[in-house]
Regions:
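Carbohydrate-associated surface elements
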Residues: 99
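Gly/Ser/Thr-rich active-site cleft segment
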Residues: 2, 8-10, 21, 118-238
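Conserved small/polar residues in nucleotide/adenosyl-binding loops
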Residues: 294-300
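Catalytic phosphate/nucleotide-handling subdomain of diverse soluble enzymes
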Residues: 239-293
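N-terminal glycine/serine-rich phosphate-binding loop of ATP-dependent small-molecule kinases
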Residues: 1-92, 120, 148, 220-221, ...
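Short beta-strand segments
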Residues: 73-76, 153-156, 234, 254-260, ...
Length: 300
């Protein structure tokens, strides 16, 4: 039996084939571009992500029996805003985690709504990279596009949608949207009201390991895989990396250095940093939370 891991990074997708013992059988990477249409902006076309996956998976399986693939799990860059219309077509390029255009919206959330309220609603305060400020930016600057939004997704969730046809996300990734009530693991009605969106526009929530569906007939044919391959909800990249490093349960520290740098400590119980210096996110191990501090490079 084989399992496929998808890591949707900022500059490339990394694909891994693993057998049932946990041994790595093959690794493939495919790059895609980042657009910087204005100073401080950072965007990608979700179609480029999917094209890279479709090109990479057949190469990953070259020399292996594709009929033995039983499951797929995706992780990836967090916070990016993917918006779909009523036909599930992408409305505009994804605004990435390292995009800096939303400072005015961040100032509104932290200053007018207030950090204390945000912390109560979501266990976090606003940062430019988070998803909610991007929604407010769209509402303020692209009202026609904002009015067309049928579904709001994160980057790896778009890949899961293309694989399964299901609009879904997991708690670890959703924690970085500033739309999730992290403590109670549900969408925050207060934040939805602030951002002017409905819960029906948001994806269904899952634990990272839970199956969300199997491959659509189209995805199975495109990728050369059986249609009964199970796809799990997956996780945000840092939560997924933490599990891979053994940072599960309480009192473990994980440091990740990539396009961004992250440091977080796992916890068995929910908590909020009263100084607002750390983020409180759901973890991919299910029900546990960790505090996250990251540094982001500035886009061009």
């Amino acid at each position: 039996m084989y399992y496929i891991g998808i890591d949707l990074g900022t500059s490339a997708v990394k694909l891994l084939l693993m057998d049932e013992t946990g041994s790595i059988a093959n690794i493939v990477s495919r790059e895609y571009p980042i657009a910087f249409p204005h100073p401080g902006w950072s965007e990608q076309d979700p179609a480029d992500w999917w094209a890279a996956v479709c090109d990479g998976i057949p190469a990953l399986l070259d020399g292996f029996d594709a009929s033995q693939v039983k499951g797929i799990g995706a992780g990836g860059q967090m916070h990016g805003l993917v918006v779909l219309d009523k036909n599930d077509a992408v409305i505009r390029p994804c605004i990435l985690w390292n995009d800096g255009r939303t400072q005015r919206q961040v100032d509104y959330l932290n200053g007018v709504i207030g950090k204390d309220k945000l912390s109560r609603y979501t266990a976090n305060i606003a940062f430019a990279g988070f998803t909610a400020p991007k929604l407010l930016w769209m509402r303020d600057n692209e009202p026609d596009n904002f009015a067309r939004i049928e579904k709001i997704m994160l980057p790896k969730d778009y890949i899961n949608y293309k694989l399964t046809g299901v609009h879904c996300t997991d708690y670890s990734d959703a924690s970085g949207m500033l739309l999730l009530d992290v403590e109670h693991k549900c969408w925050s009605n207060e934040m939805l009201d602030i951002c002017g969106v409905q819960e029906s526009q948001l994806p269904k929530l899952f634990e990272s390991w839970q199956p969300v569906g199997t491959l659509t007939a189209e995805a199975a044919q495109t990728l050369g895989l059986p249609a009964d391959v199970v796809v799990c909800a997956g996780a945000g990249d840092n939560a997924a990396a933490a599990v891979g490093c053994g940072a599960v349960g309480g009192g473990k520290c994980n440091i990740s250095l990539g396009t961004s740098g992250t440091v977080f400590i796992t916890s068995n119980t929910f908590g909020v940093d009263k100084q607002n210096a750390l983020h409180s996110f759901a973890h991919a191990d299910g029900g546990y939370h960790f505090c996250l501090l990251y540094t982001s490079p500035s886009p061009r």
